[in-house]
Design a protein with these regions (language model features):
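Non-catalytic structural scaffold of enzyme domains
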Residues: 1-233
Length: 233
């Protein structure tokens, strides 16, 4: 079977896009360059902030997302992936703009939770992802219960790490409040934490956070490798 071309609709943000590409590369079974899937990346940093648009009337990110989707299709992508959880609120609009499939990161995460036998997970995500309920609607279609931070302070700590830590590239950011938010979710019964913003997997590495987790970026990478006709490891 010939390999299919992966199109990454990226730039939301650039570090998350790089993290996804690295995971595709690291998790492909390949003894030579030619065994890897071909990947086209549009790291479109003109895409407006998704949370600001969803919750605060900010600039609509969809026009630029659609430009990127069409651009990737025009240069030969066989399917698309979007390394941004909050952007999946616009998944349907992106799908309508192209004639190629778009993998769904949150659905792939749901499937991974079910496969691991997780009964209760805690969600770490942007205000836009949490308040629009996109994870709740997708995850709770299965048997997995989903917890979100139960205090404004804990959710603010998550947003702080995403925007002022990971996105800002602050290597010495104080993550004490974020650690507390993670520990509160685990104390309430979460077996794992869903890293429901693509800035969080790099942040977990950067700040050496070792809580049990499911990484949606990794699940998207694995799904893309398989969809491209390659083997995963």
């Amino acid at each position: 079977m010939s390999k299919k071309v992966i199109g990454i609709l990226g730039g939301m943000g650039p570090l998350a896009t790089a993290d996804l590409f690295q995971k595709i590369t690291l998790h492909t079974v390949a003894a030579c360059d030619q065994a890897h899937p071909r990947v086209c990346i549009d790291s479109n940093t003109d895409i407006a902030d998704r949370t600001a648009a969803l919750l605060h009337g900010g600039e609509d990110p969809v026009p630029e997302m659609i430009k990127s989707a069409k651009r990737l299709e025009s240069i030969g992508a066989d399917f698309l992936i979007m390394p941004c959880n909050t952007a999946h609120n616009y998944y349907g609009q992106v799908c309508e703009a192209v004639t190629i499939p778009v993998l769904h990161m949150i659905a792939l995460t749901r499937d991974a939770l079910k496969e691991r036998g997780v009964k209760c997970a805690g969600l770490l995500a942007t205000d836009g992802t949490v308040q629009t309920g996109i994870y709740q609607r997708t995850i709770e279609q299965s048997v997995v219960a989903l917890l979100t931070p139960d205090s404004a302070a804990d959710q603010a700590a998550v947003m702080d790490v995403i925007y002022n830590g990971g996105k800002a590239g602050d290597l010495t950011h104080d993550v004490a409040a974020f650690r507390a938010a993670c520990e509160h979710l685990l104390a309430r019964g979460a077996e794992v934490l869903i890293l429901g913003c693509t800035e969080l997997p790099p942040a977990f590495e950067l700040y050496r956070l070792d809580y049990p987790n499911v990484d949606p970026t990794l699940e998207l990478a694995l799904g893309a490798i398989r969809a491209a006709g390659c083997e995963t490891k």
